[in-house]
Swiss-Prot record:
Organism (species): Neosartorya fischeri (strain ATCC 1020 / DSM 3700 / CBS 544.65 / FGSC A1164 / JCM 1740 / NRRL 181 / WB 181) (Aspergillus fischerianus)
Family per record: Belongs to the glycosyl hydrolase 47 family.
Catalytic function, reaction form: N(4)-(alpha-D-Man-(1->2)-alpha-D-Man-(1->2)-alpha-D-Man-(1->3)-[alpha-D-Man-(1->2)-alpha-D-Man-(1->3)-[alpha-D-Man-(1->2)-alpha-D-Man-(1->6)]-alpha-D-Man-(1->6)]-beta-D-Man-(1->4)-beta-D-GlcNAc-(1->4)-beta-D-GlcNAc)-L-asparaginyl-[protein] (N-glucan mannose isomer 9A1,2,3B1,2,3) + 4 H2O = N(4)-(alpha-D-Man-(1->3)-[alpha-D-Man-(1->3)-[alpha-D-Man-(1->6)]-alpha-D-Man-(1->6)]-beta-D-Man-(1->4)-beta-D-GlcNAc-(1->4)-beta-D-GlcNAc)-L-asparaginyl-[protein] (N-glucan mannose isomer 5A1,2) + 4 beta-D-mannose; N(4)-(alpha-D-Man-(1->2)-alpha-D-Man-(1->2)-alpha-D-Man-(1->3)-[alpha-D-Man-(1->3)-[alpha-D-Man-(1->2)-alpha-D-Man-(1->6)]-alpha-D-Man-(1->6)]-beta-D-Man-(1->4)-beta-D-GlcNAc-(1->4)-beta-D-GlcNAc)-L-asparaginyl-[protein] (N-glucan mannose isomer 8A1,2,3B1,3) + 3 H2O = N(4)-(alpha-D-Man-(1->3)-[alpha-D-Man-(1->3)-[alpha-D-Man-(1->6)]-alpha-D-Man-(1->6)]-beta-D-Man-(1->4)-beta-D-GlcNAc-(1->4)-beta-D-GlcNAc)-L-asparaginyl-[protein] (N-glucan mannose isomer 5A1,2) + 3 beta-D-mannose
This protein's name: Probable mannosyl-oligosaccharide alpha-1,2-mannosidase 1B
Residues forming the catalytic site: 367 (proton donor)
UniProt pathway: Protein modification; protein glycosylation
Cofactor binding mode and count: Ca(2+). Can also use Mg(2+), but with lower efficiency.
Keywords, comma-separated and alphabetical: Carbohydrate metabolism, Cytoplasmic vesicle, Disulfide bond, Glycoprotein, Glycosidase, Hydrolase, Signal
GO cellular component: cytoplasmic vesicle lumen; endoplasmic reticulum; membrane
InterPro entries xref list: 6hp_glycosidase-like_sf, Glyco_hydro_47, Glycosyl_Hydrolase_47, Seven-hairpin_glycosidases
Lineage: Eukaryota, Fungi, Dikarya, Ascomycota, Pezizomycotina
Gene for this chain: mns1B
Length: 493
């Protein structure tokens, strides 16, 4: 997964939390924010010139891709960031495009998960912002109302995926034939990263069907069966039977495939504490169990902390860029619950993931890394001794999770170091990934110049990387309160 992101009204963190802030000199704030806006506009202009209305820009060949069903994923994913940046021109361009999308038509298989987090999340967050703090950006209110109608249209197209014996949905579906790929299981993250957007859709439309469908699927994750599917309190396996709703393994991880299930537990509680107190309880159990059973420090760098995986009595000493949202999740949960211990542990996780950026040649973190001293590649022994990890996959595909957690750390602590880390990451992405028309991924972050480049610009560059970088440096921490900032972060990206 990419992330999340936060999610719609999503992680409605109340501004009454009174998070501490530090203030940059206005000139520095303005120049950093302006640089991020320029990078966003650069990527957007390239997308519009060479790829619109397709899903993504191919920023080296100056062509386009349609990996997300050809509905214009980059445009929809960019909406909330364009709103936060108060770019009315781009906002209205995107609204005009969304009004023309026919979500009932595609020649490709549809991913329920990806379509929910990019399209449904993108439209709902845009709707909330344009009905609230950014209402002045769009003069024609019917264009904003269209976002909710299109969200409902999309939900109606997708909802047959939940028509299974258990209510656990199929992920890969054919919206024309109402068929599926014949899978017997669905993943933890895929099943557990629908409930926020689908619940929000019900709350906005008054039609409870969407919430009921997603919450029924979630119910199996909140009360896992059999007991082997929950090796530690709150920590559950990675695969669920579509037929029965039971867990089919006990593989525990905060990595891709499981990650955003844990992320959404706390965000559901923040969204509505009265309705979703159980989600909070499950997140707390998972967070505490992770501290007790998954926290791991490299032998060469005992000052660092990562979350290991667990399976059948053994820890796996490896992690992913995707998992680096974990520090931000602890910081959000710890702040909302007034738990200093969870905040402190979250900052340890942030520091660990920060090193995956600080130690590479590009200053950008790898797709996956390990710290098992018995498995260090021969050509990385010196690097491991210094850095505390070794690179497993050196790719960088414009993922946001590390910057996301830096952003949380800055908002929670007010410490300049975290804002600087966001800025340094942004500068390095701008340096090594930028092309003439946009931003490309890197094949090896620990090679000179990042190795070669991937000819693809993921939509979550717009939805998350640029948004977190901008919000960290926006003058006055942006004119939108922290509650509304989190509305903006609907799309996980």
């Amino acid at each position: 997964m990419h992330l999340p992101s936060l999610s719609v009204a999503l992680a409605l963190v109340s501004s009454s939390l009174a998070l501490p802030q530090t203030v940059l000199p206005e000139s520095d704030v303005s120049s950093h924010a302006a640089a991020v806006k320029e990078a966003f506009s650069h990527a957007w202009d390239g997308y519009m010139k060479y790829a619109f209305p397709h899903d993504e820009l191919l920023p080296i060949s100056n062509s386009y891709g349609d990996s997300r069903n050809g509905w214009g994923a980059s445009a929809v994913d960019a909406l909330s960031t364009a709103i936060v940046m108060r770019n009315a021109t781009i906002v209205n361009q995107i609204l005009d495009h969304i009004a023309k999308i026919d979500y009932s038509k595609t020649s490709d298989t549809v991913s329920l998960f990806e379509t929910t987090i990019r399209y449904l999340g993108g439209m709902l967050s845009g709707y909330d912002l344009l009905k609230g703090p950014a209402a002045d950006l769009v003069k024609d209110s019917t264009k904003v109302d269209m976002l909710l109608q299109q969200s409902k249209n999309l939900g109606d197209v997708l909802k047959f995926a939940f028509d299974t014996p258990s209510g656990v949905p199929y992920n890969n579906i054919n919206i024309t034939s109402h068929g599926n790929d014949g899978a017997t299981t669905n993943g933890l993250a895929v099943t557990g990263t629908l409930v926020l957007e689908w619940t929000r859709l019900s709350d906005l439309t008054g039609d409870q069907e969407y919430a009921k469908l997603s919450q029924r699927a979630e119910s199996y994750l909140l009360a896992p069966q059999p007991s082997s599917g929950e090796p530690f309190p709150g920590l559950v396996g990675s695969e669920i039977s579509i037929q029965t709703g039971q867990f089919t393994n006990g593989f525990v991880s905060w990595n891709g495939g499981s990650d955003s299930f844990y992320e959404y537990l706390m965000k559901m509680y923040v969204y509505d504490p009265k309705r979703f107190a159980t989600y909070k309880d499950r997140w707390v159990a998972a967070a505490e169990s992770s501290i007790d059973h998954l926290a791991s420090s490299p032998a060469s760098r005992p000052d660092l902390t990562f979350l290991a995986t667990y399976n059948k009595g053994s820890l796996g000493l490896s992690s992913q860029h995707l998992a680096c949202f974990d520090g931000g999740s602890y910081l959000l949960g710890g702040t909302v619950l007034d738990r200093a211990d969870l905040i402190d542990f979250g900052l340890k996780l942030v520091d660990g993931c920060a090193e995956t950026y600080h130690q590479t040649l590009t200053g950008i973190g790898p797709e996956s890394f390990g710290w098992d001293e018995k498995s260090v590649p021969a050509d990385q022994k010196e690097f491991y001794e210094r850095a505390g990890f070794y690179v497993q996959s050196g790719a960088y595909i414009l993922r946001p999770e590390v910057i996301e957690s830096f952003y949380y750390a800055y908002r929670v602590t007010g410490k300049k170091q975290y804002r600087d880390w966001v800025w340094n990451a942004f500068v390095n992405i701008n340096k090594y990934c930028r092309t003439g028309s946009g931003f490309a991924g890197l094949t090896d972050v620990n090679a000179v110049n990042g190795g070669n480049r991937y000819d693809n610009q993921e939509s979550f560059l717009f939805a998350e990387v640029m948004k977190y970088a901008y919000l960290t440096h926006a003058p006055g921490m942006s004119p939108i309160s922290i509650a509304d900032e989190d509305k903006a972060n609907e799309s996980r990206g």
